[in-house]
């Protein structure tokens, strides 16, 4: 009975659902022999001795993917037809040999059946083991994809081109492409599928033929089709071949990222980019604004000490509700501003009497002590005797009232280098220097005018 079926296939789908057709190898009952004995339509002229009792060796070349294509077309045609009783006209293509039946039935059928089952199981194991074909491994070893930031799915991203099936038998029955069902129909996806880099002749893309739907139609798909739920499968399905040049590789990587971000089941990478951008915007420092009270207290501290210690900085930060870093930066900026002001004051353009006097506080009015005390001579008084006479607001014995509270003066050695600038002697010397510079400039201007207008 092992040689009665000349159209044996491993999937046995035809024999499973069509009970009205001739029995297969597994139906080793008396009904099968009676069926073949009752049939009278067998012609010895059409008998081929080599077409049965012989199973070809399993081949795993590229042509094996289309070995059963015509048989699947015939299966679909038989499924469309209603089931009927077996007649000679209904199955004319099956040639039933009855000569070899008595010889095979005399032998023990159980060992043959077990051998066939073992052969089928071994074939299934081999197909599962070599699901990734040797040509694929050879292509990956000879042409490895380098410098990829992702984990490539080599089953879908191999460099493979196969021939199309015959257009006469599959022109109107080809199922839609796998990308149309699972990939998002974005413009970038359509451009990638219809890019001119892919061949448009007799060679088609690897995914266009090896999609799970078409593999199920050809009957070669052993394992269930992968679902597009994992990031690797989702990314691997949307592209076909790895890039060959750096430009193509960057385009393919960008297309993977865009397609994965737009798919419904994938993680939203654009949300991460927006979050990073918003974090960068928030991390930009804003300009610190100080209140009038804070500015006044900082100016008072800067007047006494241009450089403050860390202990004093901590006290000021606690009193003004600021951070130590803000106070440190404020003092740095204030020192730079003071240096810039002194540089501008020392320049010849700012040495006018009225302009310079307007920049300085009224020293003559503030330098006068109360009338009850004798007036000291300015040129005989040392610098350390009265260091803060120019600013009586910080002295407890003064009669003038200000908004900020009175403070006791710090030790005299803190402000000694800066007291000389606010004495009347220093003010008079500076005015004399400015007047001397103005006289020199006027003389130079007169000399240049005389040389210009009194030409020979």
Swiss-Prot record:
Biased composition of type Polar residues is found at 444-456
Residue range(s) of DNA binding per entry: 283-342
Q: Which domain of life is it from?
A: Eukaryota
Q: Where in the cell is it found?
A: Nucleus
Biased composition (Low complexity) is annotated at 421-443
GO BP, sorted A to Z: negative regulation of transcription by RNA polymerase II; periodic partitioning by pair rule gene
Stretches the record annotates as Disordered: 338-380, 400-456
User: InterPro entries recorded for this chain?
Assistant: Antp_homeobox, FTZ_N, HD, HD_metazoa, Homeobox_CS, Homeodomain-like_sf
Cellular component terms, GO, for this chain's entry? nucleus
Recorded GO molecular functions are: DNA-binding transcription factor activity, RNA polymerase II-specific; RNA polymerase II cis-regulatory region sequence-specific DNA binding
The cross-references to CDD domains, in alphabetical order and at most eight, read:
homeodomain (cd00086)
Q: Which SUPFAM superfamilies match?
A: Homeodomain-like
Per the record, the major location class is: nucleus
Keyword annotations: Developmental protein, DNA-binding, Homeobox, Nucleus, Pair-rule protein, Phosphoprotein, Transcription, Transcription regulation
Its function, per the record, reads: May play a role in determining neuronal identity, may be directly involved in specifying identity of individual neurons. Required during embryogenesis for the process of body segmentation. Homeotic protein, required in alternating segment primordia, it specifies the correct number of segments.
Q: Which family does it belong to?
A: Belongs to the Antp homeobox family.
What does the further note read? 'Fushi tarazu' means 'segment deficient' in Japanese.
Show the PANTHER family listed in the entry.
Answer: HOMEOBOX PROTEIN HOX, HOMEOTIC PROTEIN ANTENNAPEDIA-RELATED
What protein name does the entry list? Segmentation protein fushi tarazu
Taxonomically, what lineage is the organism? Eukaryota, Metazoa, Ecdysozoa, Arthropoda, Hexapoda
């Amino acid at each position: 009975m092992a040689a009665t079926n000349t159209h044996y296939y491993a999937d046995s789908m035809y024999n499973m659902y069509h009970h009205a057709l001739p029995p297969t190898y597994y139906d080793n009952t008396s009904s099968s022999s009676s069926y073949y004995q009752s049939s009278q339509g067998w012609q010895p002229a059409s008998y081929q001795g080599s077409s049965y009792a012989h199973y070809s060796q399993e081949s795993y070349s590229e042509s094996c993917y289309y070995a059963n294509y015509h048989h699947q077309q015939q299966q679909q045609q038989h499924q469309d037809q209603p089931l009927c009783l077996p007649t000679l006209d209904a199955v004319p293509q099956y040639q039933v040999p009855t000569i070899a039946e008595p010889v095979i039935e005399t032998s023990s059928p159980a060992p043959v059946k077990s051998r066939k089952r073992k052969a089928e199981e071994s074939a299934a194991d081999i197909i599962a083991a070599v699901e990734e074909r040797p040509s694929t491994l050879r292509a990956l070893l000879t042409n490895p994809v380098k410098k990829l930031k992702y984990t490539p799915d080599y089953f879908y991203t191999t460099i493979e081109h196969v021939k199309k099936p015959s257009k006469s038998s599959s022109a109107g029955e080809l199922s839609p492409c796998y990308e149309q069902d699972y990939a998002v129909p974005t413009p970038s996806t359509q451009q990638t599928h219809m890019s001119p880099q892919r061949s448009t002749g007799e060679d088609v893309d690897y995914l266009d033929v090896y999609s799970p739907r078409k593999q199920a139609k050809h009957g070669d798909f052993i394992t269930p089709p992968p679902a597009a739920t994992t990031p690797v499968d989702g990314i691997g399905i949307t592209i076909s071949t790895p890039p060959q040049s750096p430009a193509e590789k960057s385009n393919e990587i960008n297309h993977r990222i865009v397609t994965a971000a737009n798919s419904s089941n994938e993680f939203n990478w654009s949300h991460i980019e927006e979050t990073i951008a918003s974090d960068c915007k928030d991390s930009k420092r804003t300009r610190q604004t100080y209140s009038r009270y804070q500015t006044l207290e900082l100016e008072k501290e800067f007047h006494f000490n241009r450089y403050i210690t860390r202990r004093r900085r901590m006290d000021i930060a606690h009193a003004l509700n600021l951070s130590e870093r803000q106070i440190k930066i404020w003092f740095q900026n204030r020192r730079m501003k003071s240096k810039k002001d002194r540089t501008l004051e020392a320049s010849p353009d700012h040495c006018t009497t009225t302009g310079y006097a307007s920049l300085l506080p009224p020293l003559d009015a503030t330098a006068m002590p109360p009338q009850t005390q004798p007036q000291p001579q300015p040129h005989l008084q040392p610098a350390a005797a009265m260091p803060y006479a120019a600013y009586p607001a910080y002295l407890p014995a003064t009669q003038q009232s200000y908004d900020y509270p009175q403070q006791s003066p710090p030790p005299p050695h803190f402000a000694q280098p800066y007291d000389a600038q606010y004495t009347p002697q220093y003010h008079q010397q500076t005015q004399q220097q400015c007047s001397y510079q103005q006289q020199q400039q006027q003389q130079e201007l007169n000399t240049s005018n005389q040389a210009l207008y009194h030409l020979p």
